[in-house]
């Protein structure tokens, strides 16, 4: 939604050198600590070694207590995976987590481990124990740094801002800001010109404004306008493209809202009507049929968990600008 993955990957490409190795892994598909350890070891071995012999040597040197099962494809340098046969309660896990530090020492370099969709670890069984183990090992490493990022803001916030969790204040938190309109205008117009088409500054700006500068939506809407443009983008091209973006996202919005309770839908209706705080006043409770003050808290937590609302500067908002328009049409708000 915000382009964080592409930003991190671009930074990785720029920073990579003989003295700084970058390891990137996406753990979205990991459903257990065992999945994580397999993915972690595979990524570290693969992305810090330039030859098959080298990562096989590193396995022998640094994973001596483990008998990993190695699967190779046609290209062993890019197509291989590791399955670790280990006892989760033994020191073998620490051996895996220490792998990047030991490789960095051997190579005389520093390593940055970039882990995408890091919030997945909150879903693991005995997650808090798992988190404690990661932090206890990682915080003592001297040559390895960690860039941990994810797409579910409320879960990431909880992992790093909840005092009772192991990763509390583990590092500096960076919240990505939206890309500025001026930068988007130059980018959009440049992409049109590269294909012998034109779009005015005003229309490019309108694309940004209509979707509140959300990276994925700006790119999607600009692309839809581009498809409809013959030579010069028109207002009609823009309006048709905007309807397209609503239509294309309607199935997703329907799926996200079909199981909502009446209270939850009423809460969203209140936001659409301009209520962003003080939901527990008698006037708001009665007008939008939200039940009791306690019920409002339950509804709010549920909608935050579903990522349908967010809290920004103590104001409750619907963060998705296209969904906002769709909801208004559906609810007649």
Model-assigned labels for residue ranges:
Residues 2, 6-112, 294:
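P-loop NTPase nucleotide-binding core
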Residues 14, 224, 302-305:
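Alpha-helical DNA-recognition elements
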Residues 34-41, 181-189:
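An amphipathic alpha-helix signature
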Residues 82-152, 161:
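Conserved Walker B catalytic segment
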Residues 172-183:
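Conserved AAA+ ATPase "SRH/arginine-finger" region at the nucleotide-binding site
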């Amino acid at each position: 939604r915000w382009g964080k993955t592409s930003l991190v990957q671009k930074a990785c490409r720029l920073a990579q050198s003989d003295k700084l190795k970058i390891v990137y892994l996406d753990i979205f598909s990991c459903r257990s600590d065992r999945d994580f350890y397999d993915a972690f070891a595979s990524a570290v071995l693969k992305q810090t070694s330039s030859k098959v012999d080298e990562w096989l040597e590193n396995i022998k040197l640094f994973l001596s207590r483990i008998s990993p099962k190695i699967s190779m494809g046609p290209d062993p340098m890019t197509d291989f995976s590791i399955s670790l046969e280990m006892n989760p309660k033994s020191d073998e896990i620490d051996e895996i987590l220490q792998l990047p530090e030991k490789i960095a020492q051997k190579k005389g370099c520093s390593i940055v481990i970039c882990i995408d969709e890091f919030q997945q670890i909150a879903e693991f069984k005995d997650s808090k124990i798992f988190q404690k183990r990661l932090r206890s090992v990682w915080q003592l490493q001297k040559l390895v740094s960690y860039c941990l990022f994810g797409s579910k803001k409320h879960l990431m916030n909880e992992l790093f801002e909840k005092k009772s969790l192991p990763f509390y204040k583990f590092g500096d938190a960076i919240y990505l800001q939206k890309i500025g309109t001026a930068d988007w205008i130059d980018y959009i117009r440049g992409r049109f010109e590269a294909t012998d088409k034109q779009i005015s500054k005003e229309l490019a700006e309108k694309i940004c404004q209509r979707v509140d500068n959300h990276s994925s939506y700006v790119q999607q809407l600009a692309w839809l306008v581009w498809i409809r443009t013959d030579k010069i983008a028109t207002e009609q091209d823009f309006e048709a493209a905007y309807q397209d973006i609503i239509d294309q996202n309607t199935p997703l919005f329907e799926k996200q809202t079909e199981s909502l309770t009446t209270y939850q839908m009423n809460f969203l209706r209140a936001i659409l009507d301009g209520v962003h705080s003080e939901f527990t006043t008698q006037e708001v409770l009665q007008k939008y049929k939200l039940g009791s003050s306690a019920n409002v808290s339950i509804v709010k937590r549920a909608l935050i968990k579903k990522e349908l609302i967010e809290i920004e500067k103590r104001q409750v908002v619907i963060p998705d600008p296209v969904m906002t328009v769709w909801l208004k049409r559906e609810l007649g708000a």
